[in-house]
């Protein structure tokens, strides 16, 4: 064993389904300026208003999908960590969560006390967004700076277009996609439109026309979450040999009144049912592990909404989770992660 650790980082989860734990988790999550990018006083006021009712609602949702072992996201991430231990030969494999426990700070501090000087930081997000990738990187840098840790990072870059990831995604979904169904919906997590426009390096591309994501230049694509999502969908459909009209893309998990990227998953579920789709497959390629957004938002509420609109069956395709091919692909991606300056 060497002194080069691999640190897998996912979003996080409440410690339990209690309202108090959910409130604490939501407060930490929503107060992140990369998540709600408003001035602190406005963000504090908005989050305080959200926390009046949302914790109880979310606690009920978490309880409906909670496993005996704990949070599905944490359990599945632990299983992936175990898979990666057999793949990563350069040192220990650790898991941290951006919000909740185990925290990035606690894990990095422990690694440093063990003499670990090199860490490959792996945000487990295929597509780039400030609210996912950037906040993980900046939190890790903050810990090293504040704790004065002697740690050098290599950082896994967004891997939405990497063949290893796409091949693993296709292989894990193939048993479901090869079954009989009417339509495949690829539902990605949504973002406020302003999160994209503020990162547009040209200042003249995002949302200027209906095909902006399809026609994105390499410069724009590097930081455009929506364009990267459409890229994943197109590459997946091409690898699976899916014809036009058999699949579509939508964006879920809206929060607040700001304009979010479209089309919205809720509207798409209703429209597909009204168009005569009876059996619908849904994949959520923005997530590498099943979580409340997949299991509850799509698997439970999405199914109910689809049926109310006239659909009959909604099949949720599992995320990559601890799939062995995914673990092998992730190891390859992490091995070539560049060293941060």
Swiss-Prot record:
Pathway: Porphyrin-containing compound metabolism; protoheme biosynthesis; protoheme from protoporphyrin-IX: step 1/1. Pfam families: Ferrochelatase (PF00762). One of its GO terms (molecular function) is metal ion binding. It comes from the Bacteria. One of its GO terms (biological process) is heme biosynthetic process. InterPro entries: Ferrochelatase, Ferrochelatase_C, Ferrochelatase_N. It catalyses: heme b + 2 H(+) = protoporphyrin IX + Fe(2+). Fe cation binds at residues 189, 293. Transmembrane segments: none annotated. Signal peptide: none annotated. Coiled coil: none annotated. It is found in: Cytoplasm. Its main location: cytoplasm. One of its GO terms (cellular component) is cytoplasm. Keywords: Cytoplasm, Heme biosynthesis, Iron, Lyase, Metal-binding, Porphyrin biosynthesis. The keyword Metal-binding applies. PANTHER family: FERROCHELATASE, FERROCHELATASE, MITOCHONDRIAL. NCBIfam families: hemH. Catalyzes the ferrous insertion into protoporphyrin IX. Belongs to the ferrochelatase family. This is Ferrochelatase.
């Amino acid at each position: 064993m060497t002194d080069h650790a691999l640190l897998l980082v996912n979003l996080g989860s409440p410690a339990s389904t209690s309202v108090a734990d959910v409130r604490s988790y939501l407060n930490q999550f929503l107060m992140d300026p990369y998540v709600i990018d408003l001035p602190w006083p406005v963000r504090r006021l908005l989050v305080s208003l959200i926390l009046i009712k949302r914790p109880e609602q979310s606690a009920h949702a978490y309880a409906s999908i909670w496993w005996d072992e704990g949070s599905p996201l944490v359990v599945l991430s632990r299983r992936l960590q175990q898979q990666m231990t057999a793949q990563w030969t350069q040192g220990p494999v650790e898991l941290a969560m951006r919000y909740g426990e185990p925290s990035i700070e606690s894990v990095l501090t422990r690694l440093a006390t063990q003499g670990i000087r090199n860490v490959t930081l792996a945000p487990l997000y295929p597509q780039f967004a400030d609210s996912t990738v950037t906040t993980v990187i900046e939190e890790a840098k903050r810990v090293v700076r504040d704790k004065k840790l002697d740690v050098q990072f290599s950082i896994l870059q967004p891997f939405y277009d990497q063949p290893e990831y796409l091949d693993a995604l296709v292989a894990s979904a193939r048993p479901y996609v090869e079954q009989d169904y009417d339509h495949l919906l690829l539902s990605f997590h949504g973002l406020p439109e302003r999160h994209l426009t503020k990162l547009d390096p040209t200042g003249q591309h995002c949302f200027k026309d209906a095909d902006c994501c399809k026609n994105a230049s390499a410069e724009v694509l590097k930081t455009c979450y929506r364009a990267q999502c459409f890229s994943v969908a197109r590459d997946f459909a091409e690898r699976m040999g899916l014809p036009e009209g058999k699949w579509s893309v939508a964006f879920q998990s809206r929060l607040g009144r700001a304009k979010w990227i479209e089309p919205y998953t809720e509207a798409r579920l209703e429209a597909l049912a009204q168009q005569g789709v009876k059996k619908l497959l849904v994949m959520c390629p923005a997530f590498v592990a099943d979580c409340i957004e997949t299991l509850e938002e799509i698997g439970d509420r999405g199914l109910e909404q689809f049926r109310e609109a006239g659909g009959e069956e909604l099949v949720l395709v599992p995320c990559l989770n601890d799939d062995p091919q995914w673990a092998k692909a992730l190891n390859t991606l992490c091995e070539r992660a560049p060293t941060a300056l």
